[in-house]
Amino acid sequence: GIFLNALKNFAKTAGKGVLQSVLNTASCKLSKQC
């Protein structure tokens, strides 16, 4: 239902945010700019 869809959308958005920060951390470590 609506609740499940909202939960899925939230998980997708949260997952993107986590992935983005992991990528940012990894790239800053690789370029030694942390």
Swiss-Prot record:
Subcellular location: Secreted
Main location, first listed in the record: secreted
Keywords assigned by UniProt, alphabetized: Antimicrobial, Disulfide bond, Secreted
Tissue note: Expressed by the skin glands.
InterPro entries, alphabetized: Antimicrobial_frog_2
UniProt KW Secreted keyword: yes
One Pfam family from the record: Antimicrobial_2
Descriptive protein name: Brevinin-2Rf
